[in-house]
Curated annotation (Swiss-Prot):
Homodimer. Pfam families: ACP_syn_III (PF08545), ACP_syn_III_C (PF08541). NCBIfam families: fabH (TIGR00747), PRK09352.1 (NF006829). This is Beta-ketoacyl-[acyl-carrier-protein] synthase III. The last Arg residue of the ACP-binding site is essential for the weak association between ACP/AcpP and FabH. The lineage of its organism: Bacteria, Bacillati, Bacillota, Clostridia, Eubacteriales. The active site is at residues 113, 253, 283. Belongs to the thiolase-like superfamily. FabH family. HAMAP family: FabH (MF_01815). It is found in: Cytoplasm. It comes from Desulfitobacterium hafniense (strain Y51). Pathway: Lipid metabolism; fatty acid biosynthesis. The gene is fabH. Keywords: Acyltransferase, Cytoplasm, Fatty acid biosynthesis, Fatty acid metabolism, Lipid biosynthesis, Lipid metabolism, Multifunctional enzyme, Transferase. It catalyses: malonyl-[ACP] + acetyl-CoA + H(+) = 3-oxobutanoyl-[ACP] + CO2 + CoA.
Length: 331
């Protein structure tokens, strides 16, 4: 099989910024409390009329420009999201149509905050096996639309945005070197939006009970996240024949600083190698890792030949990690 790598990245966040001081006027909280417990100072919020497909489209345009690839050349579009425009059609279809990706196959993928990692792992297999040549993977969310803005335990955490990556064949020995993906359905109720599916279809009752908003058992999710982030990163590195000492850049899911700091400590990696932007964006679920990836690539934190690890966890419960030898040289 051929080597597959990321040859272009892009990201987009809405213009509207919601600061901790704004939240002080909405719920019983304050800036010091939020920063000390999460590290978040502000987050970007989409306008009510803006769907996630708009954010995904903007990120995709930037990624395609970075990869110097025309939309017509795309063979596959995958969108990872828990906030699609509609139950169906897939947001990937809407984004591909707007881009003009006329010959591409496409579908949505749902693995919550781990979604982008599941997306790139899936897309890479299509390219590695010779089925497709060019794939676009997008992680996008408008989480502000599924938040209970009266619940200070969740509404302070999340933001809106999208990140995208273009995958192609790259030179041998570069690109994706190893993956680790996993799930534990027994923990599904710890992080969920119970309303709107076939279990609890939308009704006046589900709306009144705020079942169409994110519900989270914070302390249990925290304990799971701290443990699994280190474990899955090390497993992916082992599959790549590498160790933590080989890593030049770590891009974790941007949940909160306490989780990131604890995972970094467990891994024993230099904090200077870790990309953190959650102070400006909050937790953007499937968009967190690709937005951080794009910022790292464009700021010069990722250089040719660097070993980079993306690692995350999310509802499901799900988790995953991908090890990449960085190369922007598409073949």
């Amino acid at each position: 099989m051929v080597s597959v790598g990321i040859v272009g990245t892009g990201s987009y966040v809405p213009d509207k910024v919601l600061t901790n001081f704004d939240l002080e006027q909405m719920v019983d909280t304050n800036d010091q409390w939020i920063v000390s417990r999460t590290g978040i100072k502000e987050r970007h919020i989409a306008e009510p009329e803006t769907p996630v497909s708009e954010l995904c489209y903007q990120a995709a345009v930037r990624a395609l420009e970075d990869a110097k690839l025309a939309p017509e050349e795309l063979d596959l579009v995958i969108v990872a999201t828990i906030t699609p425009d509609f139950v169906f059609p897939a947001t990937a279809c809407l984004v591909a149509e707007r881009l003009g990706a006329k010959k591409a196959a496409g579908f949505d993928l749902q693995a919550a905050c781990t979604g982008f990692l599941y997306g790139v792992a899936t897309a890479a297999q299509f390219i590695a096996t010779g089925i497709y040549k060019n794939a676009l993977v997008i992680g996008g969310e408008t989480l502000s639309k599924i938040l209970n803005w009266e619940d200070r335990g969740t509404c302070i955490l999340f933001g809106d945005g999208a990140g995208a990556a273009v995958l192609q064949q790259v030179e041998e020995g570069y690109g994706f070197l190893g993956y680790d993906l996993g799930m534990d359905g027994a923990g599904g109720s710890l992080l969920t939006m119970p309303g709107g599916g076939s279990m609890h279809p939308a009704s006046a009752e589900t709306v009144a009970k705020k079942m169409h908003t994110i519900q989270m058992a914070g302390s249990e999710v925290f304990k799971f996240a701290v443990r699994i982030m280190g474990e899955t990163a090390l497993k992916a590195l082992d599959k790549a024949g590498l160790g933590i000492g080989d890593v030049d850049c770590l891009i974790p899911h941007q949940a909160n600083t306490r989780i990131v700091d604890a995972a970094v400590k467990r891994l024993g990696i230099d904090a200077g190698k870790v990309v953190v932007n959650l102070d400006r964006y909050g937790n953007m679920s499937a968009a967190s890792i690709p937005v951080a990836l794009d910022e790292a690539a464009r700021s010069g934190r990722l250089n040719y030949g660097d070993i980079m690890v993306m690692v995350g966890f999310g509802g499901g419960l799900t988790w995953g990690a991908a090890v990449v030898k960085w190369s922007k040289r598409g073949v």
